[in-house]
Amino acid sequence: MNKEKINDYLQNRNVVMFVTSLFFMLGIFAYFSQKEILIACVSMLILVLLLAFSLIGVKRALFIAFVFYAGFALTMFRVKTSDELVPYAPLNAQFYGRIVSIPNSAESDKSKFFFEVEKIGNNHVSGKSLVTVSAPENMIQKLNIGQKILIKGSLRKPFISTNPSQFDYSKYLRNFGTFTVLYSDKGEFKILNEKMPPKWKFLNSLNNVRNSVLKTHSKYLKSPNLEILGGIVFGDDAVAPPDYIKASFINSGLLHILAASGMNVAFIFTFWFYILQFLKIPYKPRVISGMLVIILYTLMTGLGASVIRASLMLLFVLAGKLIDRDAHSVSLLSFVAVLMLLYNPAYINDVGFQLSFMVTFGLLTTANVLVRKFDKIPNWIKSIVFIPLVAQFWVSPIQMFYFNTISIYSVLANISTVSLLSVISFMGFVSSVLAIIKPIANFTCMIFDYINNYLLTILVWISNFFGNLPHCIVQSSHPEIFQLVIYYLMLIAVTCLINESKYKKTVITLLSVSLVLFCTTLAPVSKDLEVIAFDVQNADSFLIKTPQQKYFFIDTGKAPYRSGSSQAKIIMLKYLKDRGIKNIKGVIVTHFDNDHSGGTCDIIKNEKVATLYLNNANPETQTARNIFKTSKEIHQKIKFVKNDNIIYKEPNLTMKTFKVNIGGKDASNASSTVTLLSYKNFDMLFMADAGVVTFNRIKHNLPHNVEVLKVGHHGGPNVVSKSMTDYLDTKVSVVSTGINYFGHPNKGTLDILRNTLILRTDMLNSVKISTDGNIYKIYSYDNQDKKYKIKETLHAKK
């Protein structure tokens, strides 16, 4: 493509608006990424290059630079970094305030909502918290947006990312101007009968209408069909689907069906418009009333980013129709993006915002070009094939970035459901609108839901079919930001080349960029032994990587609390997925206490584990019973550890287990599996929850020089002694601990270890030890820069 052609593209109104909005977004992204200097330098360099090649003028370059810094400044001044609730956390107290979001949960006895706190006890405060409340279903159903409530609960700060690849819940909640979480497990709340301001009364009434419609549907549809229809009509921000349905739709690539989007908005407006046309209402009143209906529908859905985007675009298009002005598609999309970010810059971190705009941009550009180029193919075939295909190309990198997965059959699943979904959506919208009219609500829903019930069952069957096919989901490593940029630049270039009918250059571009992307994934393989101590609070989980790239876990952290996720799922498995690690040589479960074995089921279900090493065959706890049950279901190979037994060898490296039987009230801890890892001159001893008594039984089989000691039982009492540290001559002590009620680590234990370098996960976050067998380096995880930073370099004794 020559310079003149590029210049023509850059003068296009759509391109001008798109580039301007892109630099505005870059300014916002620079603030959130905390790489403002780097991004500013790269952005200004791009403008300088465009100027140097005379592709843009000086005035436009200065204006775009201004837009970039305006985006950064806006974000800096608009985004809060704290509120008045933060100094109070942690605190158990009674809170007074207003529910400011639609209460929502996938479980009938639990609800989540944002809560504007006005009082803590008798103290006046101002702040917003995310509430999770558990209570009987009849109490949960009474909660509604706009209500003033009194609630007793525990105010906490959300967890931050203290491990590589870990989801940062604190950072996520900051996008909503929220810096604390409030848990109420006993349903100790009271709804107050206070007069609502007009704004909240209106939103409350609107949500009552939505709930009334869903309640009418519930007479004729049962779970999961009810939640699926509710998600299609009102979006998953307002109606949460069951977890197993969500998992099925993720595997099949159909999850977007459950999110309100442009299709929903278009259906609502079209239905309203043609009803009024049938009633012979004039054109302008039809359009204006339709715009009001769209606004009401958007408020009813819970205000998800995708439905806001679709609604704003349609509203601007309709406003243009009223004044005889046509909107340029990409310009309008760019303008809406800027408008949303002006209102809330944190939208840029919202996955729904990113997916919605990326898919829409792809459909307006790539799909539009393909439809024009293949003009001999019937439009209905092009719509069925090109739309899901192009959408998949544009969203796949984002899915890989956030979820480490690619749905292989997504395009086929979407093609299979296009017609079906159109019928379900139309009938769902029509019946829901008519259900607002009380006298005909039951009759309407009974007729429409009778048919929809069969169609929804077929939809679930299609999702399960594609979601259960072999290799339906492929795990991917975590792409870097620059790789995403290269990929999307390639898509834009390919779209432009196809538009110009330059197919040979299209193929060359695809091959060249694919090669570049492949090269960026290549990295030198470390030949060192590496041990990672994950920060799993007052629990244990260690990942060992041998010089021959074999992976072992020693313990797997805690099990899920209530309906949450295990530490293995949110920390360790995410780490493995980001690095494309799919095979684990062995998992050593030192004993069946929940804080050591709670994540085992998730590990063996999601990774290919060659051998599961268990401490004993006694299903003494619920966690143990779950492990044996899951192992049987998936045919997991199990070995029971023996005392002084080598379980793995490779050149210069051995891994040995020790197991002694000790009775008494602390038998489980004292009898837990001890592991010795040796590589050349380097040794590390993992004591699990065992202490001095256990050590004295096995010390005759241990070396006198152990460089690193993983201290037993989170640094509790009686886990080390002076004679033990003298015997091992330990230089480094690792204590895996966090907030607890047991006094871990014990002061006496820390006194004994004071002559060693103490590495506490509650202070240093995740810790990594890397060694070539002679020199070992110690790193701690920096949650600001999101990487390990070196702390010490030491020499192993010969």
Specify the residue positions occupied by each region the protein language model found:
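N-terminal leader/targeting segments
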Residues: 1-90, 205, 309, 357, ...
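Short hydrophobic helices that act as membrane-entry/anchoring signals
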Residues: 200, 204-218, 226, 379, ...
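Membrane-interface helix/helix-cap signal primarily in integral membrane proteins
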Residues: 2-10, 68-256, 570-577, 583, ...
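Hydrophobic alpha-helical segments
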Residues: 1-33, 320, 430-465
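Hydrophobic alpha-helical transmembrane segments in multi-pass membrane proteins
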Residues: 15, 19, 56-65, 182, ...
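Non-globular, low-confidence helical/coil segments that flank catalytic cores
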Residues: 138-154, 172, 178, 195, ...
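Residue-level signal for inorganic ion chemistry
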Residues: 27, 97, 352, 395, ...
